[in-house]
Design a protein with these regions (language model features):
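Glycine-rich FAD pyrophosphate-binding loop
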Residues: 75-92, 223-232, 549-571
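C-terminal catalytic lobe of FAD-dependent flavoproteins
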Residues: 265-326, 344, 398-465, 469-478, ...
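Helix-loop-beta segment of a Rossmann-like dinucleotide-binding subdomain
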Residues: 94-108, 237-246, 446, 618-629, ...
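Active-site lid/adjacent beta-loop-alpha segment flanking the redox-cofactor pocket in flavoenzymes
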Residues: 349, 353, 357, 361, ...
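Dinucleotide-binding Rossmann-like beta1-alpha1 core, especially the glycine-rich loop
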Residues: 140-142, 150, 574-661, 784
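FAD-binding core/adjacent interface of flavoenzyme oxidoreductases
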Residues: 13-57, 112-198, 218, 285-296, ...
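Central helical "cap/lid" subdomain
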Residues: 565, 729-774
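Helical element adjacent to the flavin cofactor pocket in flavoenzyme catalytic cores
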Residues: 111-126, 132, 251-268, 676-733
Length: 904
C-alpha cells in the first residue's frame, strides 16, 4: 500500500494525501477534489535542517530492519530506526489496527510483538512517520519526520526499505475495486474489513493463497484463486521435500491454506494468467487464460499480485552496485554479501528492499547486517553461526518455493495497445510502442517522449513494464533514481541557502562515458563521406543538421549517447528573451557585449520555434505570455530600468512595472516587491515534445542522425576532416562542433581550443496545482530563480542551482540546492506551500564567457556552435550557421571564436 498514489484525497484542506496511509480521526474533513487554495502541507520549517548522527541508521522497520536494529543496539551501538508507517513491522509483521483486539494472535502477530518489544528494550530509537526523501551520501540523507526536514549523518547505514508489489498491467487494472493482494491483505488482516463480500484473487505466489485463506476465515466469499504457475505434480516432489526439510512450519502453512480453501469450496485454478478486468452488473469480471480454456470470474473486488519489486531507489542513488534479475517483469536487485554488505563500505542493504527473499531470509540477513555494522564500529561482536545457518536454510527454502511457483517470463508484446501502463500519466502500451516507432529506443527516451514514469509514484507501478517494452536488461538501462524518492511537501524543504556569483565548473574531458555511448548494436565498421559532420545531436546539433540538410547538404550528426537525451531534455523549457540576472552583468556590460547582442536573436528564435511546431503538426505547448523579472528594492528596480532601456534599444518589447502595476497583474506574488521588468515576448514550451519533433524533422529533411557514436579521434586530412568512431571512419568537407560541454575537447583535437567548461544545473517539478497559479515566466532580479507553470498545472523551478558529479561521474542533485531553490520559490510564490515536490533532476550545461558561434579561422571548414540559453536560441543559431556554411554573413562578429582565443 502507498505505492500507486491512486487514492489521493484532500484532508483538512491539505491536498493530495494518500487515503490508504491516513488514519481517520474525529472531526477530519475528507474531500475528493483539491481545493482552490490548498493549505500548507507541513509546519513552518526551521531555518536549517536539524541533524541526527547515530552510530547506525536503519531505514525500514520490517523484519529485516527490526532484526538489524536489534543486533546493532544489543552490541552497544546507538541506533535510529526510520519507518514511514505509524508502527513497526512492515507488510509481513504489520500489527492489528488499534480499533481491534486480538482473540488469539497467530504466529506472525506474536513474532511482530516480540521483535518490537526486544528492539525497545535494546534502546532502539523509533522514528515513525519518517520518509527518507534523498540519499546524497552514506552519511547525508534527507529525512522528513513529522513533516519536518532533517539530515541523518550515520556512521553506518542499513537500508531495509522493503518491496512493493509487482503490478499486473492488464486492461481494467485501474478500475475501482481492483487492488493489489498486499493492499487487500492489509485491510483484511490489520483492519478486519474487505472491500467486497465476494473477492477473486489472481496472480502468482503463495501470498495469494494466504490472503484467500484469511478472507475465508474472516467470513468473505472467495470466488476463486487463479494461480499463474502450473499445478504442482509428481515431478515437484524434490521441491516439496526441500520445503518440508528447511522450514516445516512454513510448508505446513501452505498445506493448511489449500485445505482451508478446499473445505470452503474455493477453486484454485492453476496455470491461469489474468488477461483483463471488465465492469459487471454486480462488480467486476476477471478474465483469464487457463489450460482448460478461458475463464471468467465475477466478484465485487479483484486482488492481483505477480510478485514483488525491491525498493532499490536509495541504494541506487548512493551508487551501490546492482544487477538485473530476469524473472517475471524483471527487477533490479542490490548486490550484497550474506551480511548485506554492498559495494560501498558504509552501506548495508537487506531484506526484500535489496533482493526478494521473504521474511526468513530478511530476519537472518538483518541480524548479520546489524552485527557487521557494530563490528565495523569497533564493537566486540562474535560471529553468529546460528544466523548463518538460518540464512542458508531460508535461502534453500525460498529457492525451492520459487521453483514451485515458477511462471514464464513476462511477455510485453502481449499487452494490448489500449492497456494503461503508466497509471499516473495515463500512458498506454500503444503510446509507448508509437514512441519507439518514432525513434525512442531506451527506457529514458521512452520516459521523455511519453512521460511514462514521471508521475507521483515515480515509476514504481510502471518502470518494470516500460523497461520490458524498451528491452532494458542492465542496471544502466533503467531510469536513474532522483530525489525526492517520494513526493515531499515543498514547504518542508524550503530553507534559505547562500547564493553564489560563479557556478562550480569542471573540464568536460573528465566526464565519464555516457550510459548509451558506444552501444551501436554491433554495427559493422564502415566509411562514410558527407558534406557536413555535426558533432553533438542535442537540440542545437539537431537544429543545425535540419537547417543544413534543408540547404541540400549531405549531413551526418553524431551523438555519444542517445540523440537529444542529454542536457537538451533536462532543461526547464523556458523561452528566454530578456537579459538574465545571473547569466551576465546585463546592462553594466554595455550595448556591444555578447549578452546585449544576443537580445537581437531571442525573439527571432521564438518565432522559429513556432515555425517548427507548425511544420511538425504539434503545438509543442509553446506559450509566450511574457516574463517578469522581480525587484525587491528600489535600487534593484533602478537596475532593471537600465536593463529595460537596453532591451528596448535592441527591439525587445520590454517595460518597467511599479509595485501597484505588478500586483494588479500578478496578485499571486508574495508581498514586498518593489516592481518588475516585464518582457512580453518571453514564454515556455515542452522540451520533451520539442526535441522529439526536431529529431523527426531533421531526419525528414535528410539528415542522418547516429546515436551511441562517440568521436574517438578527429583530424584534418588535406581538404577534409577525418573522424574516427567505433563504427568506422567519417570523412567530411566541413565540421560543426555542437558538442556542448564537450565542445572544448573536440576543438582541442583540431588544435583550436575554445574556453568551454561544464557545470551541473538543477530543475525541480511539483505536482499539478488544482488551479492556475501564474501565467508568465517569473525570474528574480537578484536571486537564482526561474519559475513557471506548465499546461498540466505543475510548477517548474530552475535558476541554475548547481548539482555535482557522483563518484561514477554522473550528474546528481545537491540537497542544499533543492532546499535553497525551494526557499527562493516560496519567497516569490507562497502557494507552493500547498504542493508536493515530485522530482528534481540535473543536467550538464556549458559555462562559457559568451556564445562561441561561427567559423574558426584557425582551421578552415571548422565551425563552432556553443551557447548558453541553448534551448531558446537553437533555431536561430541553426539558421546563422547554415547561412555561414553557404558563404553568407553568419553569426554576429562578437560571437566569433577568434574573440575568445586569448581565453582558451
Amino acid at each position: 500500500m502507498g505505492a500507486c498514489f491512486d487514492c489521493l484525497v484532500t484532508i483538512d484542506g491539505r491536498a493530495n494525501q494518500r487515503a490508504c496511509l491516513a488514519k481517520v480521526a474525529p472531526g477530519m474533513v475528507v474531500e475528493s477534489a483539491p481545493p482552490a487554495a490548498p493549505a500548507p502541507l507541513a509546519p513552518e520549517p526551521a531555518s536549517q535542517a536539524a541533524e541526527i548522527a547515530p552510530d547506525v541508521l536503519v531505514v525500514g522497520a520490517g523484519p529485516a530492519g527490526l532484526s538489524a536494529a536489534i543486533a546493532a543496539a544489543e552490541a552497544g551501538c546507538s541506533v535510529v530506526l526510520l519507518d514511514e508507517r505509524d508502527a513497526a513491522g512492515g507488510q509481513y509483521l504489520k500489527p492489528l489496527a488499534a480499533s481491534h483486539a486480538h482473540a488469539a494472535p497467530d504466529r506472525q502477530f506474536r513474532q511482530a510483538a516480540a521483535l518490537r518489544a526486544r528492539a525497545e528494550a535494546a534502546g532502539v530509537v523509533f522514528q515513525h512517520g519518517a520518509t527518507v526523501w534523498g540519499a546524497f551520501a552514506p552519511d547525508e540523507l534527507g529525512v522528513l519526520v513529522g513533516g519536518r526536514n532533517m539530515v541523518a549523518r550515520p556512521r553506518r547505514l542499513v537500508l531495509a526499505p522493503g518491496a512493493h508489489e509487482r503490478p499486473v498491467p492488464i486492461p481494467g487494472w485501474t478500475l475501482p475495486g481492483v487492488m493489489t493482494t498486499g493492499a487487500l491483505q492489509t485491510l483484511a488482516r490489520a483492519n478486519r474489513v474487505s472491500p467486497g463480500r465476494r473477492v477473486v484473487v489472481a496472480g502468482n505466489g503463495p501470498l495469494n493463497l494466504q490472503l484467500a485463506c484469511e478472507l475465508v476465515e474472516g467470513g468473505v466469499e472467495v470466488a476463486a484463486v487463479l494461480e499463474a504457475a502450473p499445478k504442482p505434480g509428481f515431478r515437484a516432489w524434490r521441491e516439496a521435500v526441500t520445503l518440508a526439510a528447511r522450514a516445516p512450519d512454513l510448508a505446513w502453512d501452505g498445506v493448511r491454506y489449500l485445505a482451508v480453501l478446499r473445505r470452503a469450496g474455493v477453486k484454485v485454478i492453476w496455470g491461469a494468467m489474468p488477461e483483463r478486468v471488465e465492469p459487471a452488473t454486480d462488480g467486476l469480471t476477471l478474465h483469464a487464460e487457463a489450460p482448460g480454456g478461458p475463464r471468467a470470474v465475477t466478484a465485487q473486488a479483484v486482488a492481483l499480485n505477480l510478485g514483488f519489486q525491491p525498493e532499490t531507489g536509495l541504494a541506487r542513488a548512493l551508487g551501490c552496485a546492482h544487477r538485473f534479475t530476469d524473472s517475471g517483469l524483471g527487477r533490479l536487485e542490490t548486490i550484497t554479501g550474506p551480511d548485506g554488505r554492498t559495494s560501498l563500505a558504509q552501506v548495508l542493504a537487506i531484506g526484500d528492499g535489496a533482493q526478494i527473499g521473504g521474511a526468513r531470509i530478511a530476519l537472518a540477513r538483518g541480524r548479520l547486517a546489524g552485527l557487521a555494522a557494530a563490528r565495523d564500529l569497533g564493537r566486540a561482536v562474535p560471529d553468529d553461526a546460528a544466523s548463518r545457518t538460518a540464512l542458508a536454510r531460508a535461502e534453500a527454502f525460498q529457492a525451492a518455493l520459487w521453483r514451485l511457483f515458477e511462471v514464464p517470463g513476462f511477455d510485453a508484446s502481449r499487452l494490448a495497445d489500449d492497456t494503461v501502463v503508466c497509471r499516473c500519466e495515463e500512458v498506454s502500451a500503444g503510446a509507448l510502442r508509437a514512441a519507439m516507432a518514432q525513434g525512442a529506443c531506451s527506457l529514458g527516451s521512452l520516459k521523455k517522449a511519453t512521460r511514462a514514469g514521471m508521475g507521483r509514484c515515480q515509476g514504481r507501478m510502471c518502470a518494470a513494464t516500460v523497461a520490458r517494452i524498451a528491452g532494458a536488461g542492465t542496471e544502466p538501462d533503467w531510469a536513474a533514481p532522483r530525489a525526492p524518492v517520494k513526493p515531499i511537501p515543498a514547504l518542508a524543504l524550503a530553507m534559505e541557502k547562500p547564493e553564489w556569483t560563479e557556478a562550480p565548473s569542471f573540464e568536460a574531458v573528465s566526464l565519464p562515458r555516457d550510459a548509451g555511448e558506444g552501444r551501436g548494436g554491433g554495427r559493422a565498421r564502415s566509411e562514410t563521406a558527407c558534406d557536413l559532420l555535426v558533432i553533438g545531436a542535442g537540440v542545437l546539433g539537431l537544429a543545425i543538421a535540419r537547417a543544413a540538410a534543408r540547404e541540400g547538404l549531405h549531413v551526418v550528426a553524431l551523438d555519444r549517447g542517445e540523440p537529444g537525451q542529454g542536457a537538451s531534455t533536462a532543461n526547464a523549457g523556458s523561452l528566454h528573451v530578456q537579459l538574465h540576472a545571473y547569466d551576465s552583468a546585463g546592462a553594466a556590460e554595455g550595448p556591444e557585449s555578447a549578452a546585449a547582442q544576443i537580445l537581437t536573436l531571442g525573439p527571432r528564435s521564438v518565432a522559429l520555434w513556432r515555425d517548427i511546431a507548425r511544420e511538425s503538426g504539434e503545438a509543442l505547448a509553446i506559450r509566450t505570455e511574457g516574463g517578469l523579472m522581480l525587484a525587491e528594492t528600489e535600487a534593484q528596480l533602478r537596475a532593471l530600468a537600465d536593463k529595460v532601456a537596453m532591451e528596448r534599444d535592441f527591439g525587445v518589447i520590454s517595460s518597467l512595472l511599479g509595485a501597484n502595476e505588478l500586483y494588479a497583474a500578478a496578485p499571486w506574488l508574495a508581498p514586498g516587491f518593489a516592481g518588475a521588468a516585464f518582457c512580453a515576448e518571453e514564454g515556455q514550451m515542452d522540451p520533451l515534445r520539442g526535441l522529439s519533433a526536431l529529431l523527426r524533422l531533421a531526419r525528414e529533411a535528410g539528415a542522418e542522425i547516429r546515436g551511441a557514436t562517440p568521436v574517438t579521434a578527429l583530424s584534418r586530412e588535406g581538404s577534409v576532416f577525418r573522424a574516427e568512431t567505433p563504427e568506422g571512419v567519417i570523412r567530411a568537407a566541413r565540421v560543426v562542433n555542437a558538442a556542448g560541454p564537450w565542445a572544448g575537447q573536440i576543438a582541442a583535437r583540431l588544435g583550436a581550443p575554445i574556453p568551454v567548461r561544464a557545470t551541473v544545473q538543477q530543475v525541480i517539478a511539483t505536482e499539478a496545482a488544482g488551479a492556475e497559479l501564474l501565467r508568465p515566466l517569473v525570474l528574480h532580479g537578484s536571486r537564482h530563480l526561474s519559475l513557471k507553470q506548465g499546461d498540466a498545472g505543475h510548477l517548474i523551478l530552475g535558476g541554475a542551482w548547481p548539482g555535482e558529479l557522483d563518484a561514477a561521474g554522473r550528474p546528481r542533485n545537491l540537497r542544499a540546492s533543492i532546499e535553497g531553490n525551494l526557499w527562493v520559490a516560496r519567497s516569490v510564490l507562497p502557494a507552493i506551500e500547498g504542493l508536493h515536490v515530485i522530482r528534481a533532476w540535473t543536467g550538464l550545461n556549458v559555462l562559457i564567457p559568451g556564445p562561441i558561434l561561427g567559423a574558426d579561422q584557425r582551421v578552415p571548414g571548422l565551425f563552432h556552435a556553443v551557447t548558453f540559453n541553448g534551448w531558446t536560441l537553437a533555431p536561430v543559431i541553426a539558421e546563422l550557421i547554415a547561412e555561414a556554411l553557404r558563404g553568407g554573413k553568419g553569426p554576429p562578429a562578437v560571437f566569433s571564436p577568434s574573440a575568445y582565443e586569448s581565453r582558451s
